[in-house]
């Protein structure tokens, strides 16, 4: 059977593809490339929020100015284009859980929630209702036929690797999604945009937290969860009260700058005692860990969970989007996933993601991932922390 460039049967003109257009250069080039190949392209932008200053700031996404940019691109490419109002859904699925997570002392990743719900669940349903054979986005990740399904791999441009934010994508979604930029470097994408005469060719890249005006996430959380702004003590791991803070939402585990106390000692946020509104600080070595425990794991590997090895699987793990995967061992026992980081890690915060790969190289396959519930410190560090928490 003849397959086109998207691994769909038949020539491109027989395939309808919905492109999720954010108004940025990446999704615009995706629409342009598919149109140039002859696909029946439909552009859709989800209006996710309208946050005043955020609608025109550099790096915003899916707000007022971005919608106008996407509309101009669609006009240039001569493709049908629609804007869908998803503000209520976005708040329910992304913004509210983001605020709740911070109020619990976690460090959430809203982009994962957005991809998991609004973009790859709700928009996928809309694409199917429009009779589309695939939904294409401008993410930098590769999707490759793998047996009877498709699998996700790190992109050619490792500096733009977005696989960390896509670990929660289900197998059903992966089979329907396409990522045409997976084999292109970012510089080439901008060149293509200029060749096509797209007005967004030099537009700034979007920021991670698109709905936060001026990057002040604490302002958003304070409005939605005012209790997270309650003042409390800043406490040294030795039990000494060092000062006061103006809300745990201003802190995250591993933070060093802006703690608000000066002791002559390099101090880091070790733990957020939400129940007692306390920020626990201490030396860097208190943050070191080799073991993580996870929740809400999305497993994309070949092994069925009921046949998961009784000991472990050798993987590469990534706990920050900007770092390459590092050697690790993955365990699954009694319904719980845990990870041993062979090289260790520091400043691991609850709520962050841990993503698994089959290897640490640039072309590694994504095996899934989950959210960190807690990490296991050294025995001494854990005992010292527990003494402070129970005082």
From Swiss-Prot:
Region ranges (Interaction with tRNA): 160-162
EC number: 2.8.1.13
CDD domains: MnmA_TRMU-like
Keyword tRNA-binding: yes
Catalytic activity: S-sulfanyl-L-cysteinyl-[protein] + uridine(34) in tRNA + AH2 + ATP = 2-thiouridine(34) in tRNA + L-cysteinyl-[protein] + A + AMP + diphosphate + H(+)
Disulfide linkage: 114-210
Source organism, top-level taxon: Bacteria
GO (cellular component) term, any one: cytoplasm
Binding site for ATP: 20-27, 46, 138
Site (Interaction with tRNA): 139, 352
An example Gene Ontology biological process: tRNA wobble position uridine thiolation
Keywords assigned by UniProt, alphabetized: ATP-binding, Cytoplasm, Disulfide bond, Nucleotide-binding, RNA-binding, Transferase, tRNA processing, tRNA-binding
Enzyme kind, highest EC tier: transferase
Localization terms from the record: Cytoplasm
Function: Catalyzes the 2-thiolation of uridine at the wobble position (U34) of tRNA, leading to the formation of s(2)U34.
Family recorded in the similarity comment: Belongs to the MnmA/TRMU family.
Protein name: tRNA-specific 2-thiouridylase MnmA
Species for this entry: Bartonella bacilliformis (strain ATCC 35685 / KC583 / Herrer 020/F12,63)
Higher taxonomy: Bacteria, Pseudomonadati, Pseudomonadota, Alphaproteobacteria, Hyphomicrobiales
